[in-house]
């Protein structure tokens, strides 16, 4: 059984989810390649520096590069896409706010792989999240910027502050119902 809690377990789930997404794109005639699927490993040293940088817009965009790229040669349609693999039996998906901001700038498709289906939505088209969660640890400068940006984009979102987070990133994130996403086939 895949470890659902540790960093390595989450990354293993993402690898499996990416393979499913790749097969689905390829089934529709797309060419697919990973872009920044393993960025946590390849950018580990840079990420540490970016978290303390005052104004890192260019590096921020590189650090939050989407997981993959898909291109349909006949239709001349391409997508940058980010794969999310929520825990089994979940009806929600969470996205770090700094990732959401960058994925919106990249005009990326967020692809969510559940136990039974593959869903997707453009980052820029997501509705107001169910909530924004701000962990009890102080945000980095870029996480604070992403939090302020998200509050402007979604002024009606409920913000829960000082929340203890046991596992995963301590960066602020937003939570959406899976109902906010359409079938991936809609985009293909």
Name these PLM-found stretches.
Residues 1-5, 10-11, 34-75:
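Active-site metal-binding core of divalent-cation-utilizing nuclease and nuclease-like domains
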């Amino acid at each position: 059984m895949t470890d659902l809690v540790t960093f390595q377990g989450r990354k293993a789930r993402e690898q499996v989810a990416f393979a499913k997404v790749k097969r689905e794109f390829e089934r529709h005639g797309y060419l697919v390649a990973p872009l920044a699927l393993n960025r946590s490993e390849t950018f580990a040293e840079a990420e540490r520096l970016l978290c303390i940088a005052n104004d890192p817009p260019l590096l921020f965009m590189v650090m939050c590069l989407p997981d993959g790229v898909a291109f349909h040669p006949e239709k001349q349609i391409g997508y940058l896409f980010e794969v999310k693999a929520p825990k089994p039996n979940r009806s929600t998906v969470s996205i770090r706010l700094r990732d959401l901001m960058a994925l919106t700038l990249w005009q990326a498709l967020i692809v969510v792989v559940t136990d039974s289906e593959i869903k997707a939505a453009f980052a820029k088209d997501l509705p107001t999240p169910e909530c924004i969660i701000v962990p009890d640890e102080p945000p980095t400068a870029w996480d604070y910027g992403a939090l302020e940006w998200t509050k402007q984009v979604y002024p009606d979102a409920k913000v829960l502050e000082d929340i203890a987070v046991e596992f995963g990133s301590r960066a602020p994130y937003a939570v959406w119902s899976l109902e906010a996403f359409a079938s991936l086939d809609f985009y293909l």
